[in-house]
Regions:
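Catalytic domains of cell-wall/extracellular-matrix polysaccharide-remodeling enzymes
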Residues: 133-252, 256-259, 264-269
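Active-site beta->alpha N-cap acidic-glycine motif
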Residues: 46, 50-140, 144-158
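Generic detector of intrinsically disordered, low-complexity, polar/charged segments
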Residues: 10, 21, 78, 124-127, ...
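Residue-level detector of solvent-exposed, low-hydrophobicity positions
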Residues: 14-18, 34, 38, 90-92, ...
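Terminal accessory/targeting
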Residues: 1-75, 91-100, 221-270
């Protein structure tokens, strides 16, 4: 009799677990189906219409269910500069009365002194992207990461007589960064920034970049956009700014008074 009861309990447990699993799978499928539908609709619009027309017609209707009293903030961040594209980027930002944040490489700062000075003088956010841009070099020892960003700071000071404690680790702060290296940066007052929206501009066309902003940038009160100093990124920048403004975002530079968003803290969307 006892054996029979145990069998019944086991079968009951299996039945309940199966029901719970089925509900979970159904929910996930429904969620993925909804997300895929939105993405497909966005891509269809891009195929059927001129991208400029879509950008011009983008408005807060997409976010009609969000709280309009909630301030929406966007940070446009640009990696790997300065470069031959920096002046064009700065011109576009100036035309749109927008400030971005530049995470710069040490050797590029040395090559493009005038662009570094202009970034600082025009009030953009200033940060560092390292010296080597190589995970083997960057994380060779527990102090090598800190050494790279201290070198960047020295270079910035030599060019502009200013310093910064904003940093972005190449390829993001996870999964490559050892905890000790991350802690060394934080303990030396560096603010590590990742992103919440990757435009994938390094491998995308202009229209694909804009599509990524349209899709992944919806229904968020605060976004950190990752871009790079690429030709296609320059071409997409004006439309990106228009989308953000049409959706009610205030576009701001990152400063040292803002709490960072990174994958260690867990306040980003990977």
């Amino acid at each position: 009799m006892g054996k029979k009861k145990r069998v019944i309990r086991i079968l009951s447990g299996i039945f309940v677990s199966t029901i719970i699993l089925s509900i979970g799978i159904s929910y996930k499928q429904a969620y993925n189906k909804t997300n895929e539908k939105i993405k497909t609709e966005t891509q269809s619009k891009l195929e059927e219409n001129n991208i400029s027309d879509i950008v011009e017609n983008t408005s807060d209707k997409i976010n009609k269910d969000t709280d309009e009293s909630q301030e929406k903030i966007a940070y446009i961040t640009i990696d790997d500069g300065p470069s031959k594209y920096t002046s064009q980027i700065l011109d576009i930002l100036e035309e749109n009365n927008v400030k971005a944040t530049f995470f710069m490489l040490n050797d590029n700062m040395k090559l493009y002194n005038d662009e570094v000075k202009r970034i600082v003088n025009e009030g953009h956010g200033v940060g560092f992207h390292g010296v080597s841009h190589d995970v083997d070099e960057l994380y060779k020892t527990s102090t090598s990461t800190l050494d790279e960003f201290n070198t960047c700071n020295k270079t910035l000071y030599e060019i502009t007589n200013t310093t910064s404690n904003l940093v972005r680790l190449p390829y993001g702060s996870k999964p490559y960064t050892p905890e000790e290296n991350y802690n060394n940066l934080v303990n030396n007052d560096y603010l590590v920034w990742d992103w919440t929206l990757d435009t994938l501009d390094w491998k995308s066309t202009k229209d694909q970049i804009v599509s990524n902003v349209l899709y992944y940038g919806r229904e968020k009160d605060e976004i950190v956009i990752l871009m790079h100093e690429k030709e296609q990124s320059v071409k997409a920048l004006s439309d990106t700014i228009k989308i953000l403004k049409n959706r009610g975002y205030t576009i701001l530079p990152i400063t040292e008074t803002i709490s960072p968003k990174n994958f260690w803290i867990g306040n980003t969307i990977e």
